[in-house]
């Protein structure tokens, strides 16, 4: 997919309510599968429905559909074979059949905690369905095996119809995170406040949302073929910005005298306003897929870093700077540097 594709208002609305969309997809898939079973009078008709729900339940982004499809179908076929062998062993020796099933379930558990959890899950589910057939009724076992494979194929078909794209979801979540960060930033350093605002819950939510985005990195990288290191870099900077914002708030409201000094510093106010505008440009770039406005921020951020560094040097020479003032100015300088890095990474993520 094109990384610089502009997001329409409809797409943004759909991805913001992806749980409703996914629930609707599963419901329609269940109804269509049920109608197919009734239309063709398929024996052991419970198992295609069970398999379809088990496979479609966890939401699959497009970057995971193909590899998970092979994992699930492979697990289903292997589970069917293991189950049929177990039924044959039961005719020879029940203890031998139990040992075989135990070994198969060990494989299921081992794979479930590895890199192929879906394959392990389907091996166990299919094995349980097949060996649940009455003793010696191979026809029933074969029908159940075929039903599980049918349910897997139908689930893959429905999952592949208008799938959720992790990269689009990642862009929307990052834009939302930066928007919320900008709001907290404005609230914390507003010149109209007389007391420190209570923003602890908002900061915690920002950090929690940043951590949740990590699950989108792998499928988004597969969809766009953008190196995971770029997503990881953006993830790290996003988390760093939230942590530094909390430290900035502490320094800004540390003491009343230092607060008034920072409040009346024109360069700092200009820097704050510039950072707010830059954050908005990031949000627009993520929604519109156009990194050009972000390129223009690099020079502004470089100038801001130099001005803040000069401000620190001037106060350092006078030896009258208080610790909160020095810390706040230094954190502003580091924030500007982090935004510069974020600007470069967003441009690379939205490349054509």
What are the roles of these predicted feature ranges?
Residues 1-210, 217-218, 222, 341-351:
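A transmembrane helix-and-boundary motif of multi-pass membrane transporters/channels
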């Amino acid at each position: 997919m094109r990384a610089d594709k502009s997001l329409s208002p409809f797409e943004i609305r759909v991805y913001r309510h992806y749980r409703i969309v996914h629930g609707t997809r599963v419901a329609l898939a269940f109804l269509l599968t049920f109608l197919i079973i009734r239309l063709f009078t398929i024996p052991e008709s419970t198992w295609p429905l069970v398999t379809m729900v088990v496979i479609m339940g966890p939401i699959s982004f497009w970057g995971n559909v193909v590899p998970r499809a092979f994992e699930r179908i492979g697990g289903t076929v292997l589970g069917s074979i293991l189950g049929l062998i177990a039924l044959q062993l039961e005719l020879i020796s029940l203890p031998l059949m139990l040992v075989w099933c135990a070994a198969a379930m060990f494989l299921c558990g081992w794979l479930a905690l590895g890199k192929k959890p879906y394959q392990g899950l389907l091996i166990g589910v299919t094995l349980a369905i097949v060996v649940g057939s009455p003793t010696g009724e191979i026809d029933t076992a074969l029908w159940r095996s075929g039903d599980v494979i049918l349910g897997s194929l139908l689930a893959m078909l429905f999952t592949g119809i208008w799938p959720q794209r992790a990269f689009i979801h990642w862009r929307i979540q990052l834009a939302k995170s930066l928007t919320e960060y900008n709001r907290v930033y404005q609230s914390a350093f507003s010149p109209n406040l007389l007391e420190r605002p209570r923003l602890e819950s908002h900061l915690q939510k920002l950090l929690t949302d940043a951590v949740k985005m990590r699950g989108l990195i792998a499928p988004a990288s597969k969809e766009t073929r953008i190196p995971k290191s770029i997503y990881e870099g953006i993830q790290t900077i996003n988390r760093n910005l939230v942590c530094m914002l909390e430290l900035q708030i502490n320094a800004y409201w540390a003491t009343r005298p230092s607060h008034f000094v920072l409040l009346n510093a024109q360069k700092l106010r200009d820097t704050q306003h510039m950072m707010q505008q830059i954050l908005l440009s990031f949000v627009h770039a993520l929604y519109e897929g156009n990194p050009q406005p972000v390129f223009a921020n690099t020079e502004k951020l470089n100038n801001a870093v130099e001005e803040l560094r000069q401000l620190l040097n001037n106060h350092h020479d006078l030896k009258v700077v208080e610790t909160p003032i020095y810390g706040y100015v230094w954190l502003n300088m580091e924030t500007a540097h982090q935004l510069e890095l974020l600007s470069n990474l967003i441009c690379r993520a939205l490349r054509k």
